[in-house]
Amino acid sequence: FQLNGYAPFAWEAPHYQSSPLAIKAVPQYFKTTYQRVVYYTSDNPQTLNASTPGHDFSVGQFFPYIIQKDYYNQRIIPENLGNVEYNICNIDPSSCLTYTAQDILTNATYAQVVRDGFASFFFHPFWLEPEIGTPGYADFQTIINGITALGFTWVDASTAQ
């Protein structure tokens, strides 16, 4: 990255999922993460299967503001609005849910009640590919314009305090 002029400043686990021990290792390399964190009831969960007696739990946590230090010793820039999802069961049988641009904007409206809060979302760039047949570009514009209209200020995440 650095050879091409990029300076990585934060870590985001793929789809926010990694083991508790991996999460604990990240701050050695990246003090900051940019994500909705998944927390576990154990540093070494034996099973997350709900039908197993005594199973461990994992839960994703949305924060409306920066967390300077959490249980895993990471600084967290929050992704708290979610991400657009289209029902593309015909292409990918595991992608059968819908989370709309309006859902993102509804969450941004809710985020306004937090003083100095965030309106941060993730948008998969592949939704912009015309061959997928989704209104990705229009929805992306709707989200940007809607969040701007709500009065949020756009900042470079690497400068977020």
Annotate each predicted stretch with a short phrase.
Residues 1-17, 107-124:
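CE4/NodB-like, metal-dependent polysaccharide N-deacetylase domain
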Residues 2-4, 27-51, 115-161:
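C-terminal domain-boundary segment and adjacent tail
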Residues 11, 75-79, 121, 147:
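Generic structural hydrophobic/aromatic packing signal, biased to beta-strands
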Residues 15-112:
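Active-site-adjacent pocket scaffolds in enzyme catalytic domains
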Residues 7-14, 87-98, 124-134:
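The substrate-binding groove and active-site-proximal loops of carbohydrate-active enzymes
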